[in-house]
Amino acid sequence: MKKIGKRIRNQALKRIYEIPFLQKHADIAYRSAVHNHAINLPSLSATDLTLVETVKQEGVAIASLEALGIPSALKMFDIAKLLMPEIPGIVSGDKNEYVVHATPGQMVENPEIFLWGLEKRILNIAEHYFGLPVAYQGAFYRRDIANMVEHKSRLWHIDTEDRQVFKVIIYLTDVSEDGGPFQYIPRPITEQVVRKLKYKCGYIQDKNMLEALSPSNYRSCRGVSGTVVFAATGSIFHRGKKPVTSDRFAVFFDYTSRLPKYPFFSQYSLPYANLLSFSEQLDRYQLQSLLWQEYVIE
């Protein structure tokens, strides 16, 4: 009952925030914050600047852990691979089940995975994408089951929980076209489809998407184990294509800015006490991204 009450309250607040006058005022404040923060953006290498520009224009950029060369990546990746046998294939028996996540306990027991999302280089890339300080929304370790279910994140959608959403996806297994690749529609084409379908939010069946554009516009992010996908999921239609040959294992690292569009939806991905235990290993910049609710931009 408590969860239902909170959901009803949040939906009511969302409708208030979307009153045109209030929304316009919030949008002006947001643009002003981006403008004012421009001089405070961290420096990036030419390679990372190109990556950010690719994400802004296309919606996605693809790299690899090896090419990124972040020192902690090897240990994180090895630990993530070792966790794979601990993630069950089926847990509920629900015929619509298509994904199993690592439990909060498993994430706490393997902190290297969660903490990798707070690597300064990754935070700096995300900050340049947003133009604002970063809120780290957490790491989500998932096993996508090889079956024919097309539900929720396997349907076309745009992440609308904030103005912009940024994700870093690491494949733990080789992902072929039949292995459940992350799929997207390039940003310029997404914008056309949004207008054509009058899209606001929610999920779109593939048969309905095919009425709006040719499947030749679909892009599949195939890659070997260790492939890294940077995605602006708040600006592009995307989905996880259903895997049919084998289960897909991947870790998703999620980010928004510290100026949320709907602050009442905000919640940490792990218990606060666990986040505090992680904080001992972080500098101030990383800590502010981790405990971002305490450092929201006013």
Where are these regions (language model features)?
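Short, conserved beta-strand element in jelly-roll/cupin
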Residues: 161-177, 222-223, 230, 254-257
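Alpha-helical packing segments of well-folded alpha/beta enzyme cores
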Residues: 122-125, 168, 236
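Non-heme Fe(II)-dependent double-stranded beta-helix
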Residues: 10-154
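Conserved double-stranded beta-helix
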Residues: 2, 22, 191-298
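Short Gly/aromatic-enriched secondary-structure transition segments
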Residues: 79-80, 184-186
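Active-site region of the double-stranded beta-helix
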Residues: 132-135, 158-161, 172-181, 187-190
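Histidine-centered catalytic micro-motifs
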Residues: 154-160, 236, 240
